[in-house]
Amino acid sequence: MEAAMRRYAELGVHTLKTGYAGGFKGGYLHHSQYGVQHYQRVVETVAKYRIMLDVHKPIKETGIRRTWPNMMTREGARGMEWNAWSEGNSAEYLTTQPFVRMLSGPMDYTPGIFDIDYSTAKADKGRIEWNGPNAECCIKTTLARQIANWVIIYSPLQMAADLIENYEGHPAFRFFRDFDADCDWSKALQGEIGDYIVVARRAKDRHFLGAGTDEKARTLVQKLDFLEPGVTYTATIYADAPDAGRNPEAYLIGKRAVTARDTIRIEMAERGGQAITFIPAEK
């Protein structure tokens, strides 16, 4: 491991994403003494070479990231990939995790999939094996909710996990370009466990809002008093289209000028959501 990390550093590698889907040799469990000692050794070794860690299949959060801040984020939950070969993760699941798993720290869920029904995957015969015998697997949320999850599911290192061809030229990809994962302020604005959630975050002078619902369509009213008083922002809204309940890839993008005195309506389709970027307007 030492030699590998040294070589990564020489090559200018600053971030490492590890995974243990195959388990440990010898049949050791992740939370065994062997597993815990291994994780600790990895964190300390990569820190020597100033490499940041994103761990999938981790042990539970213990607060280690406060001692070793290079331990940037971790999965530690049923991640996005489960939608590819199983019944998938429900919208209710995604409105539960912010109240449960995320209390322990950042979560790398890898949200942001645009190919909701895997139409690209269905066209590739090589992918049928992991996508079910009839390629019936799919993402259980709308496209707008996939974007909103970048705000809802906090991780200081985010990954746009879909295929490049599904993002290329897509208007909604603008959100990822405008988003700053290095947030310095966060607040849960409203929500009910397993039903819905609205979260606001701030990075420098930009604010972001993410809202999501379960399998029930909802309309919420939200004050924007978390914005900086006296500043006019351009709000870019990524919302569910009226038919998103039947066509989850249907979305709308709108813009409006807002201030901290304004109130907005957040209309979400079943399994839907809404994401908003608030960028100070140019004077």
Region roles according to the model:
Residues 144-188, 277:
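Catalytic cores of secreted or luminal carbohydrate-active enzymes
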Residues 237-261:
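Solvent-exposed beta-strand/loop surfaces of large extracellular or lumenal domains
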Residues 192-229, 274-275:
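Carbohydrate-binding surface patches
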Residues 255-283:
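C-terminal beta-strand-rich structural cap/linker in extracellular carbohydrate-active enzymes
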Residues 1-137:
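Aromatic- and carboxylate-enriched substrate-binding clefts and catalytic-loop regions
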Residues 16-21, 54-56, 210-214, 238, ...:
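Generic beta-strand/beta-sheet core signal
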Residues 53, 152, 209, 271:
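Conserved, mostly hydrophobic/aromatic
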Residues 227-241:
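Solvent-exposed beta-hairpin/edge-strand motifs
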